[in-house]
Structure formats: structure tokens, C-alpha cells
């Protein structure tokens, strides 16, 4: 049975961190290592972590340089065969979620992709599916539904801390470029709340996310044809989204 490392990064996350932690510590029928990386929270986050300390393998609380830096700290501490990130606004849908994941690991892929439920602020749910193939050139993956082999980080490198939003998309694109193998499983693994940095809908946040996505596209493709496709795509798409935002 493969050992699964679950990493939670958080900062001032007292509102939801308890649900996240409980959803991990209540997993059954599997070998789980749980690592929590707190960015020196000033609210009650650390006290909540301490409350569940017996179910947490390792945790640290210290200042970091952003989400990517915190995620890299988690990777450095991990000893599992596969790693996944379940951050402070996310939680597993069921107590046997990881047991379900392990039951699907039959073909030794580098990456396993499961579905994620997106919980909207205004109410309602949306199911997000992803695939690891050519489609990733235009559509990223929800890291809350993805497990990666630990050795993949040794081959591909860590998360690029110069990204504030799209560090996971950049990592998956680099993994694809390095020939990593992936498999999509049509099962829901986790729930992701609206409100994280990647789901903000104000124009400055959208503009930053689009700028980072464009950078991911252009830096992770050596094909002249794809660079032309991306240049045309962003020349059209960015003004379209700006106009759409203006008329909301």
C-alpha cells in the first residue's frame, strides 16, 4: 500500500482550518502522513492545530515568502510515495477518500487526477474534472484533486516562488514537458471553497492570474507554433475578459 503525504499550508485560517484538519485525521484504511505548514498565523490557527496535534505527523509555524514557499517546505518534509495538497479552505468529502485513491493506483502513474467539488460563496456546487495530456496546455488542474509521486518533484523541481497564484499550474506544465504520466479517475476526492486567491474575481486579482497563466504558457512551450497560438489567444482573450468584467 503506498504511503500518502497530505500537506496543508495555511495562514490566519481559523475559520475553516479545523474542518480541513478533521477531514484528514478521520481518514481510515490507509497509510497517511499529515504535514501542516503555518505561516506564523496571528489568529487562533496555531491553537486549532495544537488541538489536533496527535493526528498530525509534523507541523511548523514560521514566516514564509508566500504560498509556493510554504508548499515547498511541505514537500521537503514529506516521506510519502505520493503527495497532495489540501489547504485551509479545502476538505475531503468522505472519511474513506484516501482509501478510494489508493484503490485506484493500479498502473504506477506519476500523477493521479480526481474530481473536485467547487463550493460557491453564493451557494451551489460545480464539479471540476481535469486531464493530464495536451489539454493541460489550456486548462489547469485543481491541486486539491491531484496526487503526485514524491520523486516527480526531484525530477521536475519545486514550485516556483515567483508565482503568487499559478505555481501549481506551472509545476504541472513542467511535469508534462518532462514526460510525466498521468491518469484521470472519475471520482470526487475533495471539496474546494470559493474565496481562495485563485478564485478571486476582482479585476486586479484576475489581471494578475491571467498574467501568470500567460507566463506559464509561454515559458513551458518551446514549439514556435504553440507560442504563436498563445500569443494570439492572449491578445484576444485578455481584452475580452476586461470588457466582460466592466459590464458585470
Provide a role label for each language-model segment:
Residues 1-202:
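Nucleotide-sugar donor-binding/catalytic module of glycosyltransferases
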Residues 73, 246-247:
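Short, surface-exposed amphipathic charged segments that create phosphate/polyanion-binding patches used
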Amino acid at each position: 500500500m503506498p504511503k500518502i503525504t497530505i500537506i496543508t499550508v495555511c495562514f490566519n485560517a481559523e475559520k475553516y482550518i479545523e474542518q480541513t484538519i478533521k477531514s484528514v485525521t478521520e481518514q481510515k484504511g490507509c497509510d497517511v502522513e499529515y504535514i501542516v505548514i503555518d505561516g506564523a498565523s496571528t489568529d487562533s490557527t496555531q491553537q486549532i492545530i495544537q488541538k489536533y496535534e496527535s493526528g498530525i505527523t509534523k507541523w511548523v509555524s514560521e514566516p514564509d515568502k508566500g504560498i509556493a514557499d510554504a508548499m515547498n517546505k511541505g514537500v521537503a518534509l514529506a516521506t510519502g510515495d505520493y503527495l497532495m495538497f489540501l489547504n485551509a479552505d479545502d476538505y475531503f468529502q468522505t472519511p474513506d477518500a484516501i482509501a478510494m485513491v489508493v484503490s485506484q493506483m493500479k498502473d504506477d502513474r506519476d500523477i493521479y487526477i480526481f474530481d473536485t467539488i467547487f463550493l460557491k460563496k453564493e451557494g451551489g456546487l460545480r464539479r471540476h474534472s481535469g486531464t493530464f495530456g495536451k489539454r493541460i496546455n489550456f486548462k489547469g488542474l485543481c491541486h486539491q484533486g491531484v496526487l503526485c509521486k514524491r520523486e516527480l518533484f526531484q525530477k521536475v523541481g519545486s514550485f516556483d516562488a515567483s508565482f503568487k497564484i499559478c505555481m501549481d499550474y506551472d509545476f504541472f506544465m513542467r511535469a508534462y514537458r518532462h514526460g510525466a504520466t498521468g491518469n484521470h479517475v472519475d471520482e470526487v476526492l475533495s471539496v474546494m471553497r470559493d474565496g481562495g486567491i485563485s478564485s478571486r474575481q476582482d479585476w486586479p486579482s484576475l489581471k494578475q492570474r491571467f498574467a501568470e497563466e500567460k507566463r506559464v504558457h509561454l515559458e513551458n512551450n518551446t514549439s514556435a507554433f504553440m507560442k504563436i497560438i498563445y500569443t494570439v489567444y492572449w491578445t484576444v482573450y485578455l481584452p475580452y475578459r476586461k470588457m466582460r468584467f466592466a459590464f458585470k
